[in-house]
Amino acid sequence: RSRGLGDVYKRQVVLLSAAMCVAALGGCGSKAGSSSDSSKKTAENSSKEDDQKAADEVAKKIDAIYVQERNDKTDEQCKEAKEAWDKLTDAQKELVEGENADPDYFGRDTGDASQDDPLNEDNIGEKELLVVSFGTSFNASRAADIGGVEKALQVANPDWSVRRAFTAQIIINHVQARDGEKIDNMDQALERAVKNGVKKLVVQPTHLMHGAEYDELTETVNSYKDKFESVKIAEPLLGEVGADATAINEDKAAVAKAITAEAVKTAEYDSLDAAAEDSTAFVFMGHGTSHTAKISYSQMQAQMEPVSYTHLTLP
């Protein structure tokens, strides 16, 4: 019996020792796994930090040119911003966020920039028709709308050289940085005209009315007046502002008829009367302005009334 109990005791000791070894080995394995997981998380965090750092650097470069007035560093900064963007991964591009910067600055598809002609070449001649627009960074719209106006003016005035200028440097910088297309601002366009020996200059704005942009345009052009034999600045689309809210003119009448006809056509009615009979009203909306020219909206509303556009309104 003594030997039997001893054998049992020995077996228990052996089993307990084996269990302790297994537990010890299991514990060692758990620590190793925990260490591996920790290293993996550290690497992931480090990678995320690196991604954000790269994105932040691009955001700084975009912010630097976003609202920058043109200077001797603009060209290089536009180039550097785009090159830095191109080096980012798709995931890093989504992280770009600054005061003004976001992924759309370089990442949004607005059409083929090569379809747009910036009209910034020399060999102008003595007569120039300078078409001045606020501008847009949407390539397809710029080519079709602004480019369409420029082309129409060139066809109508074959003896004149048509050139382009934008008043919004924020747009000029954006297009140059993203697409490599250089568009003249007002000073660049006027300096180009002087350099090319232009004698007769006609400035045709595509602006809607006598607002802040138009005021700045006329101020800039007037500062160059003594460099040309003659300078003429055309009225904006809605013509002169007028004395009060009831003042209307031929320009406003032409615009009222044109936009009404287009609205009726787009709504697929045969006539304005047909739209009225169908209880359809048209509402035309403007951007609005704090400039004194805001009265132009009231004048356009007044313009609708004499031609029986009773179901047309401008809010």
Placement of each model-derived feature along the sequence:
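Beta-rich interaction/scaffold domains
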Residues: 46-108
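Extended amphipathic ligand-handling, pore-lining, and cofactor/metal-binding catalytic surfaces
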Residues: 104-312
